[in-house]
Amino acid sequence: LDYNKLLGRDPISTDLNTIQDYIKGKRILVTGGAGSIGSEIVRQLVKFGASTVTVFDNAEASMFHLEQEISRTFSKAHIKYVIGDVRDKYRLEEVFDSFKPNVVFHAAAYKHVPMMESNPVEAIKTNVLGTMNVSNIAYMNEVEKFIMVSTDKAVNPTNIMGATKRIAELYTQFLETKSATKFIVTRFGNVLGSEGSVIPTFIKQIERGGPVSVTHKEVIRYFMTIPEACQLVLQAGVLGNGGEVFLFDMGEPVSINDLAKNLIKHFKSKAKIEYIGLRPGEKLYEELLCDGENMVPTEDHNIMKLNHIDYDFKTLIPKIEKLSKIRSNDFYKILLLMKSIVPEFKRENND
């Protein structure tokens, strides 16, 4: 399956030499390193000559499979596989003490919108408090750069997952104001072929003979392939001087309805499309910029930098502390607290 043909565009290319020059010889930590994005970041870091890559993840099966693959492909790679959770700051402190990373790529997160609507406290624990743990320890250890993998769903969020990622973005920008560590945020859209994403889901439905579930005929999304997304994250890490939010040129948004039709045609299937309606927290289209943000070009034409927006960081920490103390899925209380941190957070398609 040619993903770029499916997207109707050429692959996005970036300057691999500048990435290699920066990565070579570095000690690097990748949180969520066994996931779809994290594992590809790990592969590319090994290719670019990182001296040591520490893979940190709580998914032991995925970690095992990655270890088996890497040992076959890169027999001399210096990789450490560490089971742990970003919620556990003591485990993270051990990792930083043991491996002393120069650079951190933070990819650990919960990403599934409907699942997080049902489990908002878990989204807060991982996406907000987990990011705080990793970034705080990076700050205390004076790590050179901290690159957070974020999402376009953090822009004017309409769901719990997007709101938690926006809060995490804000926290890293707060740390940037008082840190020697350069904190950098990267935002991109849906990643083709990642675990649980639309393409694998559609393919499974087609293999079963259908129906293929599309939420709405007019839904459009921005897409990138996994290698594209990871190379651009690495390049943004090279370009970043701290405090930036980087946005990638993902081409034109893609109709999910057309994507389903093209896949059915590709597999010569007779499966029908079933329109199931937008799920809680979903939009017809994703936005690229928060209110008040403007894009500025960088030296890489595939990457845009967003200007800073004013935010009262003095109020951020007390509000996050209140959020962290919620122990039950008290949806109304969670929504009110999140909206006090992210005023542009507006619910859609909910009771």
Name each model feature, range by range.
Residues 81, 123, 183-186:
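Hydrophobic/aromatic anchor residues within beta-strands of the central parallel beta-sheet
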Residues 4, 13, 17-22, 170-191, ...:
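Strand-loop microenvironment adjacent to phosphate/nucleotide-handling motifs in alpha/beta enzyme folds
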Residues 106, 110-169, 174-176:
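Conserved Rossmann-fold NAD(P)-dependent oxidoreductase catalytic core, especially the SDR/UDP-sugar
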Residues 31, 56, 104-108, 146-151, ...:
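SDR active-site strand-loop-helix element
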Residues 82-83, 125, 216, 275:
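Conserved residues in the N-terminal Rossmann fold of short-chain dehydrogenase/reductase
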Residues 50-51, 141-145, 180-181:
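A short helix->loop->beta-strand "cap" motif at the edges of active sites that frequently abuts
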Residues 1-100:
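N-terminal Rossmann/SDR dinucleotide-binding element
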Residues 50, 96-105, 113, 143:
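Proline-aspartate-enriched helix->loop->beta-strand connector
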